[in-house]
Amino acid sequence: TFRFVVKAPALVTDSLVRGEQGQGKQDNPGFLDPRLAVDTFVRPAIEGLGTKAGALVFQISPLPSHWLRAMPVVLERLSLMLEAVRDALDGEQALRSQAPDVVIAVEVRDAAFLRADIQPRLAEVLLQHGATYCLGLHAKMPPIEAQLPLLRRLWPGPLVCRGNLHRKHGTYGYQAAKDLYEPFDRIQDADPETRSHLTRVILATAARGLPALVTINNKAEGSAPLSVEALAQEVAAVLQAADTLSPR
């Protein structure tokens, strides 16, 4: 069954109200608001997609300095929001009955969430409310191997990963990547190391019978379809090698 990975609206996940060019104008009063999360995202997504809902991702946009200095408050807000989401899924609204395999995931755009004093608390919040961490392969974040320790804190659990922007382009490199890679018909910046790490996580997750949901952007390597094909081929090759080595 084809499953969709759906990202929550900025109304809920961006701490700032932004102008047309993306510049922050003022604080967003709806940031991580529990009611908005359920009413504007979780419920309509599940009611619209049903069993095709794979993962609902709350991608927290880059935080301004005053929020980065108040990370415990951010985590408390996140906890309250995820609690409301879980209540909507499993409580009186019973939304999960329409999408029994849906995964709730949180993605971030600040390495501060991976700090030694913050990461354990983030993992605790996610575990408490039945959510997982979405691996964010993006130039704003550390490479995949630096994010895996957080995923290990949640193990065993489903995998959600979004490959967005090759690290070579820097934190604001979307337009540069688009200009370089169009018409997105070939891989121009292969990232075999990331692919190898991701392959291992996919196989370990699937071996536990858990969902492994991965999306890849054209700006990750140059061509999303070819990146997906290369990842699938590596997964298949590792499986074939393991089958060859196993006793008959």
Language-model features: locations:
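Residues lining hydrophobic/aromatic ligand-binding pockets adjacent to catalytic sites
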Residues: T1-R248
